[in-house]
Amino acid sequence: MTRLETIEGIGPVYASQLRAAGIATVEALLAAGATPAGRQELEQRSRIGHALILEWVNIADLMRIKGVGEEYSDLLEEAGVDTIKELRNRVPENLYEALVKTNEAKRLVRRLPTLGMVRGWVQQAKVLPPKVIY
């Protein structure tokens, strides 16, 4: 099980609010926030706003891709990919170039993913069943 704090933006205060609402892991966050009704309930129980809950659920969803993790999920999000649905529709070579440019501008990761890694992410996204409903 993955700690909530591995998601960028979830620090001790937000993690405490989520735990008080019954969410202790990234996996539990994804399960609870997979539907609009689930996110609304989570917002009410945690007293955290809709935009943050949705952002974190999307990151949790991206973290299902093997090799993405907390570091690369931030890079993907900054490059304009914040859902698995969006990732599955990307051309790996174009996405790789966008990741390079994003990292040059924002210095988010020390080591960029390889083109082979990005190809693998896109392929995984194409076969993973959808979890988040919008």
Q: What are the residue ranges of the model-derived segments?
A:
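C-terminal extensions
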Residues: 1-134
